[in-house]
């Protein structure tokens, strides 16, 4: 019997926490409980990452199901929640958040047409601030370095590789503003995504460019847009 996508994601997440995270069961249960509470809405973890990127500040989330507060304290970071608290350094939180985002982000099938938010392509493409970029997803889990991969690679719609010097655009799930048309998806595709996530995220210890440290960001920026030579 096949596991559902959510069941597979939970299985991968627990395996990573138990075997690779160096967290105690009490510590990683805090993250698992938050994941279970937010379901498919990963914005809480993106907001936590914003605090890491800015180096200071505080993020607070509060609803009827749980509260979460994420704060920088003297060079370390504290996550407080309805399920407990944990204090870790910058790199530990970056690693954990990147795994959560990569494992639980929805993976759209090949041929999906999406509008990308221009905010994530400033100075990389000749577009206005309010414009979106329409692309067709042509590849997923594209290796970049031994540690990093691009979640999606696409071509500009409707021209593709013709009539422009832009051959490919590499992007992450957070850049997707709208799904215009979803490509063909079946059981075989679902199994492929699960196999690739396990291979890259668990077995090989890689992560996508969705969540990056300062050092990693400098390596990635010039490769987001691939131009014809």
What are these regions (language model features)?
Residues 20, 28-34, 81-121:
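Mixed-charge, Lys/Arg-rich low-complexity intrinsically disordered regions
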Residues 3-4, 14, 88, 132-133, ...:
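Hydrophobic transmembrane signal anchors and adjacent membrane-proximal interface regions, especially
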Residues 60-76, 128-183:
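Basic/aromatic-rich interaction segments and small domains that mediate binding to polyanionic partners
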Residues 117-124, 128, 141:
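Short, charged beta-turn/beta-strand-edge "cap" motif at the junction between a beta-strand
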Residues 54-55, 88-92, 104-109, 127-134, ...:
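Short linear motifs at secondary-structure transitions and domain/linker junctions
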Residues 49-85, 90-101, 115:
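Long, low-complexity, charged/polar intrinsically disordered regions
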Residues 1-73, 228-229:
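N-terminal intrinsically disordered, low-complexity, charge/repeat-rich segments that act as generic
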Residues 91, 150-229:
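Intrinsically disordered, low-complexity, charged/polar segments
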